[in-house]
Amino acid sequence: MSFRAVITSSEHQAVWSRLILTLSTINQDIKFTIMSNELILWSMNSTDTTMYQVRLKASFFSEFSFDPGNIVFGEEGLQVIEDLQKQQHTLYSFVINGRHLSILSRKPEYDNIKEFSLSIDNSTAAPEAIINRLHIRVYTESLITKEFSPAFNPVKYDPIVIDLKYKKKFLDVYGTEESVNGEQADPRLLDFFRQVRKQLEEAKFNEGIIDAPRPAELRSEHEINFLSMDSLIWRNAIDLCTNNTEELKLDLTMNKMVITAFTKGVQNMKSSDVLKQAISISNSVSTEDVEHYCLFTTSGNPGMSKKDADSKQAVFKLRDFRNFFSANQAWKENATVNCWFCSPGDPILFEIDRGHVKLSLVQITDTAGKAVGAAPDLAIHPVLVSPRKPVSPLRAACTNTNAASNALHGVQLDAANMDAIKTLFVQDVEIGVSAAAMAHSPANRCTDENLRSMCSISQQGQHSCDGSPATNLRRVSRAGTTIAWGAGKDHVMCPDSDYGVAQDVNQLKRRKVGELAHASQSPESQDYGLGPTQQYQPKGIFD
């Protein structure tokens, strides 16, 4: 077998199905590139303005094996590359119909997939009927096996390394800054710099990129802007968009970020009729709610104000970005979306790293707002790095809320404050002489204990058995809410004022004690409720 990959996890099967469906919306054809430790899927639209790429590590699959030496037929897709560490890597690439593959990868309607496998057999022992075909085997929980063999065409892999170029430029501009204007940079951002540098070193197509020298002086052509924030913010902005909106505009400043979904209006010049109505929907977010942001600001252009120089904008198609973001919905947890963009008209890069899966989207931005005829020598301001934040803004807000709730729920009171609170049940007072004599009888001793346990539920957490205050006390709570009322310790009413209420409670107690004592007597003297003319114990058929 030249290649084999197996998916047994139901969650990974759902992710695979969603990824194939998203790739097929960009283009009908999907390109596969198989390596020893990962599988690359990517597609590009017909106008070459949008590219969507997915990198699946070998750990994403339950079983992953690749033997390029066993490939004899379809050798057009084989190629050997060498990285900067002089290590050789063998690749195998092919193109397959994405529409057919998305249908075959779909989950059955009334059944669950137990095992989903992909395999290629282009060895010398393979029959001619299965050469250059991707064998798909679906084994369901109902013990049904489905096998499909769509054909593919072997091709050479032509990598598009826009992501590596942007990350290298990102490190050249911002990666050497440990502090900005005397303020220590965010340690999480510095850790992100190290992660990006490691990705560049481990990339297989980094020749001519990572070894490029850093520019001695930054100019306007070195502009690169970076934005990192939680996917929940993007999802809220997309949910506000209607089906009529076509484009998305990102406007980022030091204090605010505005995401605007809009549609340009079209008007007939002759009849002045509106052919397409203009639509605009904006969503404003403070930069305190984003993970990181780095802005590249310039000055020196007389035709540009300071506000325009500090504002960074990017306009791109909403439809492709929505399809890209829909693949992220295959996971239940939110993720961090990293974004790199340069001047208007240059590509914008979105990246989501899920550990075993990395999603990337590259789109060409609109040239609207690009300065024409700008001065070549512009003064570069100090790099504006996001302020120092020890934890994620959204996660910090959730943590503080939970901590405050737990602190309120688990608050402890001392004995003095606990006595000053009126609990749900009235405190016990001294029982009368007759009730005390009744309680000392042997027949009522156990029933009195049961009665006290039923009538003194609220006192169990406040007093011990002998009536002394307990040492370790906690307020009785239910679902995070304490049932208590009344004044503080200094304003507690005198117990004598509640004497009338205590008398009524004592009468109820005495009545209950009497009923329990009567019930504990001998069976001959008990009332079985058979009526005045009936015998207490009816005779049996053998009496």
Swiss-Prot record:
A GO cellular component annotation in the UniProt record: checkpoint clamp complex
Gene Ontology MF term list: DNA binding; protein kinase activator activity
Start and end residues of each stretch annotated as Disordered: 512-543
Coiled coil, from the record: none
Localisation per UniProt entry: Cytoplasm; Nucleus
Alphabetical list of InterPro entries matching this protein: Ddc1, DNA_clamp_sf, Rad9/Ddc1
Primary localization: cytoplasm
Record GO biological process: cellular response to ionizing radiation; DNA repair; DNA replication checkpoint signaling; meiotic recombination checkpoint signaling; mitotic G1 DNA damage checkpoint signaling; mitotic G2 DNA damage checkpoint signaling; mitotic intra-S DNA damage checkpoint signaling; recombinational repair
This protein's UniProt keywords: Cytoplasm, DNA damage, DNA repair, DNA-binding, Nucleus
Its job: Component of the checkpoint clamp complex involved in the surveillance mechanism that allows the DNA repair pathways to act to restore the integrity of the DNA prior to DNA synthesis or separation of the replicated chromosomes.
Assembly description: Component of the checkpoint clamp complex composed of DDC1, MEC3 and RAD17.
Record-linked PANTHER family: CELL CYCLE CHECKPOINT CONTROL PROTEIN, DNA REPAIR PROTEIN RAD9
UniProt record similarity statement: Belongs to the DDC1 family.
Protein name (database record): DNA damage checkpoint protein 1
Gene: DDC1
